[in-house]
Amino acid sequence: MSSNQEPLVEGKIKDKHSETHGFEVDVNQMMDTMIKSVYSSKELFLRELVSNSSDACDKLKALYFQLREKGCVLDPVTSLGIEIIPNKDNRTLTIKDNGIGMTKPDLMNFIGTIASSGTKKFREEMKEKGNSADASNLIGQFGLGFYSSYLVAERVDLITKHPSDEALVWTSTGRDVYTIEEYDGEPFAHGTSLVLYIKEGEEEFLDPKRISEIVKKYSLFVFYPIYTYVEKEIEEPEEKKDEEKEDEKVEEETAEPRVEEVREKRLKKVTEREQINVEKPLWKRNIKEVPEEELKSFYKTVSGDWDDFLAVDFWHIEGLLSIELLMFIPKRARFDMFNKNKKNNNIKLYCKNVFVTDDFGDAIPEWMSFVSGVVASDDIPMNISREMIQGTNVMKLVKKTLPQKIFEMIGKLALDAEKYKTFYKEFGNCLKMAIGEASEGQQDGYAKCLRYFTTKSGEEAISLDTYVERMAPNQKQIYVITGLSKEQVKSNPALDAFQKYEVIYMHEVMDEVMLRGLKKYKGHTIQRITSEGVELPEDEASNEEVVKSFEEFCKKVKDILSSKVEKVTVNPRLVSVPAVISTTKYSLSGTMENIMKSQPVTEANPFAAMTAVSKKIFEMNPNHQLVKNLKALFDSNEIEKMNRILEVFFETVLIHNGFVLSDPKGFCANVFDFLCSEEVRCEEPVEEVQ
């Protein structure tokens, strides 16, 4: 645009001769584009058509007494239902209901007019009459669900009858025309039968097993019963001839044993009607009044677990949206619970009893992968295909609320000691993951669910609250020891200096992960006894002279060990062990060093290998004879001899403290050389063996 050209402003230009035109529509192209682009999967057609049938039944139910007063002949409300009838011979799939049916204007306005929703209009009419509760369960809203038929059908016949009108047949191939004619088949009171003529290549939708699978996935909790027809083989009873009956009568009279001839079983094929959606939406009921067996059956259906659940709870949440949460904790962990490649789909979202998604993204944290259940709402804003949620309010509400509710559930479970033992054995690591990721404000509430064995707990694991209650006078820290097995932590030489105090055993990888986030509990610092920063209640002034007397010796040991250690000191609190290895305050712990070194990426990456090394503190026991001997060598300036002993001593202490040696072959060579040295040589000469 040139600098002197005036911009076009709305309303600036008026043309007295302007013409108004309607948009022209290429119906064939639009239908094809709409059908293929709206739905991500062809199987969704069945969800849409079942939902339409459910709405039709709801409408009849809402208008039942009005229609009766008008003299309409109606099926009993209790008989309302949906049938899905596959016919492989005719290549047809029929979805049939005995709901409200449609009049000719309905067919033209809502089937013949794209994106015009009869259900939406019905809902609005009921709301105007003050009967919105009667329409609260209606699913449809966009007026497009019917056209999903053409995902799998080349032609659709819609046979329908409104209670106050004649039966009609609507037919179309999904192109630019449709026909409506009177139905002259078998009479029926009301309802709709949708006959789909299945396309080539879509035969899977004629398989009763596939039909059942799709219905269970999307429409399992639709209020009305959904039936399909299944072909089965049953044993055909064999009619006995008169002479055989006579023989049996004679044998009964003689009562003599006889050998019966084994006859080949004759099987015949029969077609039986089976209900697919046996389970009911339990979140619509008071969970305390639901029988245990019904809850167990529901749990197995939504979770896919073969065993019963350990705990169940229900919450109704009111916020920007109204949602129900029905959650279950299983008895045992799935073998693939922490498999990063497997999507966590144990919690499912339902809107008006129809499945929407099991993908909550980051709204459901990884640690909750053991929980199964349902998030349900009747007022979730949906996108046009009803596969995704519009906006973020639902996910925000789930993300904020659900983890807190699960920990409430776990807290209730902890009141039953035996059940909680089962839970903690299976899912304790999930709790630790949650605590490590939680904010500081949440951590205390979550961490009270932890249970640990300690140096003084005996056979019963205790909570952190119990530990704090039992802390020594003036003890400010919670003492913990970490490792990779029970045996390793129980035998760690660092415990030698803590015989007066209770120390918590943490022997799982997830403990290390948790401690990276959990620094305090109820104001008490959580302190590894193998890390720098330990504060003991006792007065350490009496040890100052001992420490001072070893200062020069410690400097020399540091010079000899060089980069292998960050610091060398003496620890007068040690009792029976000659030395321990601890780590500096902000370094990796010894356990984390071992974990990182065991990872394949560390072996292949020199930089990763370099960072997977903790900064070590060599703490020697000044009262141990071995340390006294080394100091005596230092004092007498026998440095070479001291070096040789110190090298073996240090690496032995590393092993004793659970570290993995970087050069085990070199260590063995040093030990063998030491064993052959003068220090351990026999005084009497040994005769050479011939």
Curated annotation (Swiss-Prot):
Keywords: ATP-binding, Chaperone, Cytoplasm, Nucleotide-binding, Stress response. The lineage of its organism: Eukaryota, Fungi, Fungi incertae sedis, Microsporidia, Unikaryonidae. A motif (TPR repeat-binding) lies at residues 686-690. Belongs to the heat shock protein 90 family. GO terms for cellular component: cytoplasm. The keyword RNA-binding does not apply. Homodimer. Residues 244-254 have a biased composition (Acidic residues). GO terms for molecular function: ATP binding; ATP hydrolysis activity; ATP-dependent protein folding chaperone; unfolded protein binding. It is found in: Cytoplasm. The TPR repeat-binding motif mediates interaction with TPR repeat-containing proteins. Its main location: cytoplasm. Molecular chaperone that promotes the maturation, structural maintenance and proper regulation of specific target proteins involved in cell cycle control and signal transduction. Undergoes a functional cycle that is linked to its ATPase activity. The nucleotide-free form of the dimer is found in an open conformation in which the N-termini are not dimerized and the complex is ready for client protein binding. Residues 235-257 are annotated as: Disordered. ATP binds at residues 52, 97, 146, 386. SUPFAM superfamilies: ATPase domain of HSP90 chaperone/DNA topoisomerase II/histidine kinase (SSF55874), HSP90 C-terminal domain (SSF110942), Ribosomal protein S5 domain 2-like (SSF54211). This is Heat shock protein 90. The keyword Methyltransferase does not apply.
